[in-house]
Amino acid sequence: NAAFAHDLRTPLTVLKGYDEMLQSSSDSITRDIAETMGKHIFRLERYVDSMSQLHRLEDARPQGDNSDIKNFVITLADSATIFCEKNGKKICVQNNITDISICLDCSFVSQVNNNLISNAVRYAKSAIKITYTCSKEGFYLTVSDDGCGFSKEALCKATNPYFTGENHREHFGLGLYICKILCEHHGGYLKIENC
């Protein structure tokens, strides 16, 4: 992934240069075509960036510490609430965290939390529920929504890299794959199901 992403950057830079030149054309048809090209070039650049980020995450290892889990989860819940409300979704947060000490990599957990919430916002009709639980066995994050659920195919492939749902082709299909990787790096797992 990283080598492929690196090899794509040079031709994309050349294309971007030509596109910028064409956008300054006096011909309106040429400018319109160049504007469309620019949008596709931007999407390819984001795709290349995602490939590079994915490579780094696949090699990452958790840097856990015994953080203040209770306050950490309050921060997670607050940011999830703001994001959901900003996107017009109702949210119910159930925080079952007690004063317990557990070793977590907070950046890994934050990214998993953010990816799951983002996914739920995309597919929920109107409501999302998040539950945070912690025990000596581990940290549990459950996200559910009132959307139509995963198709049979999506249940099997949702954690594969670059898999996207039918109506969301503008996304790269990396969110749940990243969640899976980070959970596994942390000694956990990602479970996806329809309720």
State what each model feature region is.
Residues 58-65, 101-104:
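Conserved micro-motifs of the catalytic ATP-binding
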Residues 150-162:
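Short conserved segment of the HATPase_c
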Residues 39-44:
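Short alpha-helical segment of the dimerization/phosphotransfer core of two-component systems
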Residues 175, 179:
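Short alpha-helical Gxxx[C/S/T] motif in the catalytic ATP-binding
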Residues 145:
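Acidic ATP/Mg2+-coordinating residue in the GHKL
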Residues 182-183:
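Detector for a conserved hydrophobic position within an alpha-helical segment of the HATPase_c
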